[in-house]
Design a protein with these regions (language model features):
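C-terminal, non-catalytic macromolecule-binding modules
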Residues: 162-182
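Carbohydrate-active enzyme catalytic cores, enriched for enzymes
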Residues: 3-162
Length: 182
């Protein structure tokens, strides 16, 4: 999504600029809000809990939407290897990544309590103990929910204390009208 908005911005010389929309900023900050420690992120449904986030993409997003949260996150993830994501991205992003400069280092912190009411997600982080709890309400009609009415994960640092058991092997039944019998 960000790449599409950035291409529109670049090709129109900034005349098409959607980055000041509050929803666009909130979409970008989602990754910062869901980051726990290091490469560990809150994961629900069939998402992995470890990802390698693209610091340069996050830096550009932060600059475009004027988000200190994203800029600080990008600085904390920065490496001197802009080619780290070349297999999974586009030539346009490769060029942008090569040209991106490291943002000024700022202390990366997130709020202690984060709530996304439309997603029914609550995240609580305690820097003193290193405990981080995430809970999600839900129902089976949500995308990617298969017999899933909620979830809770608890981490201490980068180590899981309590996690969702994960997904079973997907079969054609998983995506059929019989999925609730699994």
């Amino acid at each position: 999504y960000f790449d599409c908005l950035e291409v529109l911005y670049d090709l129109t010389g900034g005349r098409v600029d959607i980055f000041d929309e509050p929803l666009v900023q909130k979409m970008g900050e989602y990754i910062a809000d869901f980051r726990l420690q290091g490469d560990t992120y809150v994961n629900f449904a069939d998402a992995p809990h470890r990802i390698r986030a693209d610091a340069r993409l996050i830096a550009r997003f932060g600059r475009r939407v004027r988000s200190d949260k994203l800029t600080a996150m990008a600085a904390s993830l920065w490496t001197d290897a802009p080619y780290r994501f070349w297999i999974a991205t586009t030539p346009y992003r490769h060029i942008k990544n090569l040209l991106e400069e490291k943002p000024a280092a700022a202390a990366y912190t997130t709020e202690n309590r984060i709530y996304y009411p439309n997603l029914q997600v609550f995240i609580a982080k305690d820097a003193r103990t290193g405990l981080e709890l995430a809970a999600k309400g839900g129902h089976n009609a949500e995308s990617h929910n298969h017999n899933d009415i909620g979830n809770i994960v608890l981490f201490r640092g980068e180590e899981p204390v309590f996690i969702d058991g994960g997904v079973a092997t997907y079969t054609k039944t998983t995506f059929s009208d019989k999925r609730y019998t699994l």
